[in-house]
């Protein structure tokens, strides 16, 4: 655990960030789907008409939009619900540059990411807490092109082709990964800081609060 140089109270307030709570039954975990539309800064999904806008890597490759969810959709991957970002001309994902994601203050067990990486990336994601401390959490995302889960992730979406700036390469699959990061501290988290790694791209974020934590907080019967 590392002492914050700046107290979490100076972080952005949670007011205004769209979040959505999903719980199937009182005995199941609660998921918090975090909106990241305001942080979108990179194009990594293109259609046949805008191939040249892709910026997933240095060569301008991108995922085919036809094989991924439409903007704004609620999707489920391996039982985890996600809010797919509302893409615009400037971005459909967050290229990680140390952005802060403010979240409703609460106790969380896991961070789930739909993410992709140029080659494989392993870096630090920070969780900020209301006691003035932050925890460094390791996150690893495997290569979107290789398709091998180096860090134990699950494939979130696999496509049958990859887009280049001037053509579509059929038969060259790509992978967007479902990554999981544990939050072991029993404290109330206020915000997350994404890694400083421009090779890492985040498309959706969901947080999980365990049933044992919710009972301790008096939020379940």
Residue ranges of model-derived segments:
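N-terminal/edge-of-domain interface segments
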Residues: 1-221
